[in-house]
């Protein structure tokens, strides 16, 4: 079973300074405590658990938590408190343990009693491709930014600028097409493999699918997922809820971090973002509350960053479009359910 982990609100800043690359953001709130030590308001729970878990060889320790962390907000550019509930499995993590954690993630989403979807991926497929194409280390960060943004045109241009040929650039942009139902996308991805690292990643995903069985029905595979590559090294997964524009669940394997504290140990876990889930109880946008004939809200967005910022604010209020207006050549994008249209 899982044992509850109770974290202190503060940690010595040295912990976050040493493991900064594993944090979602390098900015933390620090203060000098009464004993003269520099401390920080906790920006992460997993680091604290990994530091203290210390599983013995062959042992698997399991924890769950319900905690608050403090992180910078990209929208408000201020620090905000984030309420998380999650679990961690540390030590001897095998395929069965990995499948058990993913099954718990699926069950957590199902308990919300609203339409949800879990997307999975594997960092080994992406890093294997980058290595197989001999992508220069200094070019990878820029390429990954365009991959995260699902921007095929800029990704191809950046690949060519990095010295890759047309075939290699096409292999990178082809990642954006490897998205869909888990089984069908696995078959499609096998045909695109260039190295053993990619094949091994797909085999691990196949084992996961087999282990989940009917519990995994509806699971999606997105091999272009490139978030937090410094943190995750194998399986990654993200949960979404209808009506909420951002992910409500994130998790995956973080063996490299775990091995910094306990050599030879592996780890997997996930967190649910309870603040995001509060949107489910929020009032619907006015256009969704109206009965009878639909009334559309037409919005003309300004160009550039101001338009991007305006769209993010509106999407956060429940007025997102079914297509990202930045990723399409269409002059008009809309969301019929929310009765909103962007020009």
Predicted regions and their residues:
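Acidic, His- and aromatic-enriched active-site or binding-groove loops in soluble protein domains
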Residues: 26-34, 135-159, 164, 241
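Short, conserved phosphate-binding/catalytic loop or strand-edge motifs used
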Residues: 81-85, 121-128
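Short internal beta-strands
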Residues: 117-121, 300
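Positively charged, Gly/Ser-enriched RNA/tRNA-binding surfaces
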Residues: 1-2, 10-14, 24-26, 44-57, ...
